[in-house]
């Protein structure tokens, strides 16, 4: 498959970090460093930072995303935010199914599908996260599990809508631990995801979809990971809070 036809996307996932004032300061440091990026650059920020982030990135090439959304348009869901609300705020991207949402807040493959559906209906681009726990990798069921997660998350998604889907492979054992899948391990699973897309939508769709790696990518390992044939970008956690490191990853994606 021709990697050149795909769009590289580097997305920062800030998690539960930064006040609005701190978000402005961080984005003011990041935007000049990535202004010549040859890839798409996204910052997925906490809900309370969205307004400040949109203001700080106005007129730049950095797009703003959210870290989650509810599956309902509105209703008695105290503390939740709908995809339509995010769209109305000016957000362009949203993450669904992050391993921390699955681990700590009860997200399942079905609720990830529901959130993804709602986000697509609202007109957002969705970064859908899939990945295995350490015990699942040790059991040798990584490929089967990730393929299943991908199929369920994309339930009801049309080929046209697939153009607003990014799949992020995040081995859960490499999230926030400092451990990283080898470049070969990352590429193998990203290839499984692409093969799953091919089985669902055909070869052209599989060639076109962007697949990110999301397991502790940093300035030191980004170039090797992003050089892999099926890795088209990164979902960046800790390094996205460090302007120079995030910019180095963006530069690696531009070259990769």
Q: Language-model segments: which ranges?
A:
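Active-site loop-to-helix "anion-binding N-cap" substructures in soluble metabolic enzymes
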Residues: 1-256
């Amino acid at each position: 498959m021709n990697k050149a036809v795909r769009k590289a996307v580097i997305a920062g996932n800030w998690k539960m970090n930064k006040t609005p004032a701190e978000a402005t300061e961080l984005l003011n440091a990041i935007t000049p460093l990535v202004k010549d990026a040859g890839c798409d650059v996204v910052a997925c920020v906490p809900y309370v930072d969205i307004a400040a982030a949109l203001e700080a990135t106005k007129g730049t090439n950095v797009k703003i995303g959210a870290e989650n959304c509810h599956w309902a348009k509105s209703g008695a869901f105290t503390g939740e935010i709908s995809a339509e609300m995010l769209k109305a705020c000016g957000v362009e991207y949203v993450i669904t199914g992050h391993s921390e949402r699955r681990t700590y807040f009860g997200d399942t493959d079905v609720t990830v599908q529901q959130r993804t559906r709602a986000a697509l209906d609202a007109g957002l681009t969705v970064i859908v996260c899939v990945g295995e726990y350490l015990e699942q990798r040790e059991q040798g069921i990584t490929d089967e599990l990730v393929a299943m997660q991908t199929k369920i998350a994309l339930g009801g998604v049309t080929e046209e809508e697939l153009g607003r889907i990014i799949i992020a492979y995040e081995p859960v054992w490499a999230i926030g631990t400092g451990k990283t899948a080898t470049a070969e391990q990352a590429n193998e699973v990203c290839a499984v995801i692409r093969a799953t897309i091919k089985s669902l939508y055909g070869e052209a769709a599989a060639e076109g979809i962007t697949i990110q790696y999301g397991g502790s990518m940093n300035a030191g390992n980004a170039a090797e990971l992003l050089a892999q044939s099926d890795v088209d970008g990164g979902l960046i956690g800790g390094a996205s809070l460090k302007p120079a490191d995030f910019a180095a990853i963006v530069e690696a994606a531009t070259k990769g």
